[in-house]
Amino acid sequence: MAKKVEKLVKLQIPAGKATPAPPVGPALGQAGINIMGFTKEFNARTADQAGMIIPVVISVYEDKSFTFVTKTPPAAVLLKKAAGVEKGSGTPNKTKVATVTRAQVQQIAETKMPDLNAANIESAMRMIEGTARSMGFTVTD
């Protein structure tokens, strides 16, 4: 018989830098997970993606065992890295802070494709372009 999922915990943690300190420790402690076991396994799995923020979904079972799935970094993080800026615009409709090319958008869409609810690469690119516009980025050909 399959184990019953008791709780789902969603976190965004810097790759390779999970520690028992907040916010990771308290979130996992409330779920009753072995915090050190999770942090070691997460850091080992994400060591090759240093510098990125990795969303993770942790499934906690009734017997307090757990499994977790790492997702691709958020589109906003990938766009900021591609544009070389620290943060997006506070007023995206008035102030444009950076420019990204369609080639960069396509590369980000291909990276995000497994996690996006898109039928093809063109619709995924439109989603990423929308995120870029809402951050105050200009998309150029």
Swiss-Prot record:
In its UniProt record, which GO terms are filed under biological process?
A: translation
Protein name as annotated: Large ribosomal subunit protein uL11
Q: What is the lineage of its organism?
A: Bacteria, Bacillati, Bacillota, Bacilli, Lactobacillales
> Which keywords annotate this record?
Methylation, Ribonucleoprotein, Ribosomal protein, RNA-binding, rRNA-binding
GO cellular component terms, A-Z = cytosolic large ribosomal subunit
Q: Matching CDD domains, A to Z?
A: Ribosomal_L11
- The answer to whether the entry has keyword Iron-sulfur is no
> What role does this protein play?
Forms part of the ribosomal stalk which helps the ribosome interact with GTP-bound translation factors.
Give the organism, scientific name. Streptococcus gordonii (strain Challis / ATCC 35105 / BCRC 15272 / CH1 / DL1 / V288)
- What post-translational modification does the entry describe? One or more lysine residues are methylated.
